[in-house]
Amino acid sequence: MTTIGLKRIYEAPSPNDGYRVLVDRVWPRGMTKEKADIDLWAKDIAPTDNLRKWFCHDPAKWNDFQIKYREELEGNKPALEDLIATAKARGGRLTLLYGAKDEEHNQAVVLHEFMQTL
């Protein structure tokens, strides 16, 4: 079984993070690759540029964003299943990393919920 967690990329890495995957399409501001200490930058599972720009972290668009992003994720299940399998092979812990300040209204929250159903 794989445990999936969420964490802002600006928080210090921990050995308990397991397989650390950045799920933003754009690299987080001010973050160096060394400091990020990620195992994978999964741009392909992040929201498309059009969806990301439309949402613009506006909580008023949150419900519609969730629906639209889940539709994108439906077409990307093989990549998500590969992530879970890799995390399982590396000890069973996957941490989805994101750069957004809003910890409740961001793509990683939607992705986390979606991956729980796989």
Q: Model regions: which residues?
A:
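Residues lining hydrophobic/aromatic ligand-binding pockets adjacent to catalytic sites
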Residues: 1-118
